[in-house]
Swiss-Prot record:
Name of the protein in question: Occlusion-derived virus envelope protein E56
Gene: ODVP6E
Organism per entry: Bombyx mori nuclear polyhedrosis virus
Bilayer topology annotation: Multi-pass membrane protein
Upper lineage: Viruses, Viruses incertae sedis, Naldaviricetes, Lefavirales, Baculoviridae
InterPro entries in UniProt: Baculo_ODV-E56
Other facts noted in the record for this chain: Expressed late in infection.
Keyword Transmembrane included in the entry's annotation: yes
Family: Belongs to the baculoviridae E56 family.
Function: Structural protein that is specific for occlusion-derived virus (ODV) envelopes but not of budded virus (BV).
Length: 375
């Protein structure tokens, strides 16, 4: 079996340490170079009630779980990969790309979009909004983004979002289209990779989604017809959201995060799913998440700053231009008066006294010779 298939198999709790060691031996046979130094040090944490969380003991005595190894390698989370696999080279990290393609692993697309959304939220805090007023303000502060999204609305083509739902241009205003798209996001999603993981198919798992936006129109979201792990009438599924408290749990899902604390209601064991499939919880979007999902972050900020600078320059220019023109007029008038003065002092005014007459030039002649001619 492939590396990511074997890695998925150990992403679960074990009844004893020996069972994990046997599965980890199988995993090592498919582990690429650069990763064996960590996977050669299997360990477990005793959670009680005959439950053992599998993982690995790092050289600094830190424990890293198999769920974390799955998460960072499937997401192509390079900073955390380097943090766990000390001394790993770029070619060794890049070798995971082909292995992900072999198994149609889709996770890295979501991780890339989430990383981009986090950067948008941090660098442009005005986009971290979910209200019409907030969205309108963010668009006004980012005119290039505003113009681009107006162009999309004119084209009228719906866009499928990674976070579930669609951005549809059917409302009377662009702002309302954006709010409607935000309201369609959030929930537990069953995701399947296609075409080497470059494309995905996803659907909303309603019974694992414990908090839905009251404005959600289910006709605008692809609802799963079945749960990938449990029968639709299973009490474990139908009662999954019983006692849910969003203020305490800080997430809209249960049973949707394979990397969650195994003792929390958010944890799910997906070790039986193929490597190209996963279950994930996507929290409701803000405008920053929508911008990151659409890959429109390059339209933020720069044009707004240029526009503000241009507007500021125009204002300054309009204020100082009359002053510049006045100074120019005074200098021009002074130049004319100077030439008039020069003309008058050089005698250009006609007749007058001797003061204006030229000084006579006297030419001295030599006297004639007085010597008599010789006879």
């Amino acid at each position: 079996m492939s590396f990511f298939t074997n890695l998925r198999r150990v992403n679960k709790l074990y009844p004893n340490q020996a069972s994990f060691l046997a599965d980890n031996t199988r995993l090592l046979t498919s582990t690429p170079a650069g990763f064996t130094n960590v996977l050669n040090a299997p360990s477990v944490r005793n959670l009680g009630n005959n439950r053992y969380q599998p993982g690995y003991q790092l050289s600094n005595n830190r424990f890293v779980s198999t769920s974390d190894i799955n998460r960072i390698t499937r997401n192509n989370d390079v900073p955390n990969i380097r943090n766990v696999f000390q001394g790993i080279s770029d070619p060794q990290i890049n070798s995971l790309r082909q292995l992900r393609r072999m198994d149609n692993v889709p996770d890295f697309h979501y991780h890339t979009k989430q990383t981009r959304s986090n950067a948008v939220r941090q660098n442009f805090p005005e986009t971290n909004v979910r209200t019409p007023e907030g969205v309108q303000n963010a668009l006004q502060q980012n005119p290039r983004l505003h113009n681009h999204m107006r162009t999309l609305k004119v084209a009228g083509v719906g866009i499928l979002l990674a976070g579930g739902g669609y951005l549809l241009f059917t409302a009377s205003t662009l702002v309302q289209d954006i709010i409607n798209a935000i309201n369609r996001t959030g929930g537990s999603y069953y995701v399947q990779g296609r075409n080497a993981g470059e494309n995905v198919e996803s659907c909303l798992l309603l019974q694992r989604t414990c908090r839905q936006d009251r404005n959600l129109a289910q006709s605008d979201v692809n609802i799963c017809s079945r749960d990938p792990l449990l029968a639709n009438d299973s009490p474990l599924l139908t009662n999954m959201c019983q006692g849910f408290n969003y203020e305490t749990e800080k997430t809209v899902c249960r049973g949707s995060n394979p990397a969650a604390n195994p003792n929390s209601p958010q944890y799910v064991d997906i070790s039986d799913l193929p490597a190209g499939q996963t279950i994930m919880c996507i929290e409701p979007y803000s405008f920053s998440d929508l911008v990151g999902d659409l890959g429109l972050d390059w339209l933020l900020g720069r044009e707004g700053l240029v526009g503000k600078s241009s507007n500021s320059s125009d204002g300054i220019r309009n204020k100082i231009m009359p002053i510049i023109m006045m100074i120019g007029a005074v200098l021009f008038l002074g130049l004319i008066l100077y030439f008039i003065y020069r003309y008058m002092t050089k005698g250009g005014g006609g007749g007058g006294g001797s003061g204006g007459a030229p000084t006579p030039i006297v030419i001295m002649q030599h006297p004639a010779s007085t010597t008599a001619p010789r006879r």
